[in-house]
Amino acid sequence: MCGIVGVVGNRNATDILMQGLEKLEYRGYDSAGIYVINQPENGRLIKSVGRIADLRAKIGIDVAGSTGIGHTRWATHGQATEENAHPHASATGRLVLVHNGVIENYLQIKENYLAGHNLKGETDTEIAVHLIGQFVTDGLSVLESFKKALHIIEGSYAFALIDSQNPDIIYVAKNKSPLLIGLGEGYNMVCSDAMAMIRETNQFMEIHDKELVVLTKDTAQVSDYDGNPVERQAYTAELDLSDIGKGTYPYYMLKEIDEQPTVMRKLISTYANENGKLTVDPAIVKSVQEADRIYILAAGTSYNAGFASKSMIETLTDTPVELGIASEWGYNMPLLSKKPMFILLSQSGETADSRQVLVKANAMGVPSLTITNVPGSTLSREATYTMLLHAGPEIAVASTKAYTAQIAALAFLSKAVGEANGKKEALEFDLVHELSIVAQSIEASLSEREVIEKKVANLLATSRNAFYIGRGNDYYVAMEASLKLKEISYIQCEGFAAGELKHGTISLIEEGTPVLALISSSETVAAHTRGNIQEVAARGANVLTVVEEGLNKEEDDVVVNQVHPYLSSISMVIPTQLIAYYASLQRGLDVDKPRNLAKAVTVE
């Protein structure tokens, strides 16, 4: 949520800031702004509500400089107005600050330190920059004022600060909110994630919590809040411009849906050698082996991926699996088993709720595994172990390829653990071969997109609500399918276990209600689901069926190629991703940037 970009050095700051903010749009925002300066006390501060294009329209050709900071804001404290948009200036206008996160004690700071200050907006960020500015007015240097403020401020934050009297420096600090340094020749950058800087550099440096960076065009000096130097090595990001472009696609979401066969094959090459032998880190395998219960913690789509994998993990490892919503566990962790193992699923690796659980797990000495798409992310750094999805950047807010990659990664982990345990089911499960078949199944489903588009036009284009139903793993896919549909089409959609219809939900079925039914698994389960279809059809529902090959009938709408039952959640979800995409498209909505949503939820 929100995004920061900053640059100091021999670059056109305005161009870099605007390009960076455009690359951060996927994180979600409702306003944006930049501050650019070239000579002391000659900066320009420009803000707007709405899209980055609205901000660009306000920027004249005379707005230039070699140092600048920019920000996309998602309203938390205060409404989406220009007054509340970032950057914010201190009382004298000397200091300018951008901030991501939530300052928990901002009201106490206002009461204790800022009596008499005329605040223009309603944000916690403005209070932070006024606090730093007050210490400068009291006689401290900007650096010492920044340090003093950091010792007072509580909560999550990523800060980038410019002193207009000395514009060759950007002061940076973070706690519980993502921030990276980008390193160039004669210039340096700061940003919320690497994608916003990849046009300028692929050399990055991590900032850990409660660290401060003094950034100039030639140096990035890292220290703790007391001024003690910290050594930090740079790393090279495995990104290039083609990874973050749409190419010929109208939307990132469609591109990312189409990339899923490639992602499956990439995971095969990552976690298995040329002979098909798995190469999952033995230390991870041993840690899972030693657990008497696996706890999967996640949010949103990642939570659904965990549910879709639960039965497979239990069957292959012979270890019970419990799912937890990270935002609930952070405040209400249940009684754990004697030898727990936490697995945290997060596409971004920055999910604040999951991080709160991880902090508690670390404090209790519980081993943890992060499965994420972003190397160097907070969860990957702080967990005991990490497995990467290698899915490439996922920019559309609605997650698609990360969901299927998470299930595949959990399959590799489960088979590796099961093999180590001598479990028959794991030894007989040829995952490399079966996942190759899944990749082919996905390609077959993608080739049917025109059929799906027409079905959606007839069923969902004008609907206000809809239901997904399924049994077994199809129920878990229904949960993800309903989330995807509501996220980007704004159709009120819920996923239900088909057998629960008669226990309340069927009362909502009326003439014309769309019901989308998922059928895979066994003939017995399929027969029961078809019975539920008859029940809703008898009450006027318009039904669309997605059925696995071998269980299909002539009247079914979408047929999915048959795959191994352990992996059916991957193949069955593909048509539902396309259904959501076309429903959003046909309703004239922005598929990649649904309202009120952010890609990475970095505040609780």
From Swiss-Prot:
Its main location: cytoplasm. Residues 284-423, 456-594 form the SIS domain. It is found in: Cytoplasm. Pfam families: GATase_6, SIS. PANTHER family: GLUCOSAMINE--FRUCTOSE-6-PHOSPHATE AMINOTRANSFERASE, ISOMERIZING, GLUTAMINE--FRUCTOSE-6-PHOSPHATE TRANSAMINASE (ISOMERIZING). Its EC number is 2.6.1.16. Keywords: Aminotransferase, Cytoplasm, Glutamine amidotransferase, Repeat, Transferase. Residues 2-218 form the Glutamine amidotransferase type-2 domain. InterPro entries: GATase_2_dom, GFAT, GFAT_N, GlmS/AgaS_SIS, GlmS/FrlB_SIS, Ntn_hydrolases_N, SIS_dom, SIS_dom_sf. It catalyses: D-fructose 6-phosphate + L-glutamine = D-glucosamine 6-phosphate + L-glutamate. Gene3D superfamilies: Glucose-6-phosphate isomerase like protein, domain 1 (3.40.50.10490), Glutamine Phosphoribosylpyrophosphate, subunit 1, domain 1 (3.60.20.10). Catalyzes the first step in hexosamine metabolism, converting fructose-6P into glucosamine-6P using glutamine as a nitrogen source. It comes from Streptococcus mutans serotype c (strain ATCC 700610 / UA159). Homodimer. This is Glutamine--fructose-6-phosphate aminotransferase [isomerizing]. One of its GO terms (biological process) is UDP-N-acetylglucosamine metabolic process. The active site is at 2 (nucleophile), 599 (for fru-6p isomerization activity). The lineage of its organism: Bacteria, Bacillati, Bacillota, Bacilli, Lactobacillales. GO terms for molecular function: carbohydrate derivative binding; glutamine-fructose-6-phosphate transaminase (isomerizing) activity. Disulfide bonds: none annotated.
